[in-house]
């Protein structure tokens, strides 16, 4: 991948101030977002949002003034269990590959003690094949025992 040249985007915005310029690539922290927003109209998080989705937990409040409380990681797991159960009921364990849901949750606990064990449970092919939504409870228990 070629090196990212943010200054090129900044120069474009200076040269064409009426154009909406939004940047994407290599952005991982709120400090980096804030720096880019000093120069540009928007920022997109790509890989970081996927690998560490909880990084966005405060974005609505911080960037849009939405004071409604964001969900905790535990609350997210709590709502995912009935969602998975509903998907299993609709498609059956054979028709739904559980990892089509859980793979998008692998980074949810990034940075917490036990995050690796959490990912291991959600990636275990035998457990996934069983098609049991309680897999999330087992993964969460690994976090608690690591803390």
Predicted regions and their residues:
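Alpha/beta catalytic cores of nucleotide-metabolism and tRNA/nucleoside-modifying enzymes
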Residues: 3-23, 27-147
């Amino acid at each position: 991948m070629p090196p990212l040249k943010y200054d090129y985007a900044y120069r474009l915005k200076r040269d064409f101030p009426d154009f909406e310029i939004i940047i994407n690539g290599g952005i991982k922290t709120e400090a980096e977002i804030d720096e880019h927003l000093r120069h540009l109209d928007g920022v997109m998080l790509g890989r970081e949002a996927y690998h560490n989705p909880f990084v966005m937990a405060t974005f609505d409040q911080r960037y849009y003034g939405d004071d409604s409380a964001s969900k905790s990681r535990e609350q997210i797991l709590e709502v995912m269990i009935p969602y998975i159960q509903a998907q299993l009921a609709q498609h059956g364990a054979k028709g739904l590959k559980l990892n089509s849901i859980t793979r998008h949750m692998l980074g949810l606990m990034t940075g917490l003690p036990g995050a690796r064990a959490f990912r291991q449970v959600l990636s275990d092919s035998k457990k996934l094949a069983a098609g049991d939504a309680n897999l999330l409870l087992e993964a969460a228990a690994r976090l608690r025992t690591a803390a």
